């Protein structure tokens, strides 16, 4: 069960991302982290459509942090094919640390701007 702190953090993050994406008109890079895998997708909230996605389930398993970085690079490559350069990073309720940070850094190296 989620604690009150986790719920408040999640709501605070959702509110901030919602206002940021609406104000800037940028697409949203959303991250979901499970115990085994990490998933990332670029979403156009105005149309409710996923434009590019990548996950560690399709990649070779190994070190989780290295796999997260590979997902970030794969997502950046998929975004570059579709001409996407600027996004808003939506880490959800996850702290910007470890696998989430590795994915973000690799996506930046791949050419995404956030």
Curated annotation (Swiss-Prot):
Q: Does the keyword Ribosomal protein apply?
A: yes
Q: State if Ribosomal protein is listed as a keyword.
A: yes
- Please report which protein family the annotation says this sequence is part of: Belongs to the universal ribosomal protein uL18 family.
The function of this protein is: This is one of the proteins that bind and probably mediate the attachment of the 5S RNA into the large ribosomal subunit, where it forms part of the central protuberance.
One Pfam entry for this protein is Ribosomal_L18p
The set of disulfide-linked cysteines is none
Q: Which Gene3D superfamilies match?
A: 3.30.420.100
Q: Which GO terms describe its biological process?
A: translation
What is an example of a GO molecular function annotated in this UniProt entry? structural constituent of ribosome
Q: Known SUPFAM superfamilies for this protein? A: Translational machinery components (SSF53137)
Q: Name one GO cellular component term.
A: cytosolic large ribosomal subunit
Q: Which InterPro entries match?
A: Ribosomal_uL18_bac-type, Ribosomal_uL18_bac/euk
- Tell me the organism: Deinococcus radiodurans (strain ATCC 13939 / DSM 20539 / JCM 16871 / CCUG 27074 / LMG 4051 / NBRC 15346 / NCIMB 9279 / VKM B-1422 / R1)
Q: How does it assemble?
A: Part of the 50S ribosomal subunit; part of the 5S rRNA/L5/L18/L25 subcomplex. Contacts the 23S rRNA. Contacts protein L27 and the 5S rRNA.
Question: What are the record keywords, sorted?
Answer: Ribonucleoprotein, Ribosomal protein, RNA-binding, rRNA-binding
Q: Kindly provide the name given to this protein in its UniProt entry.
A: Large ribosomal subunit protein uL18
User: Matching NCBIfam families, A to Z?
Assistant: L18_bact
Highest taxon, organism lineage: Bacteria
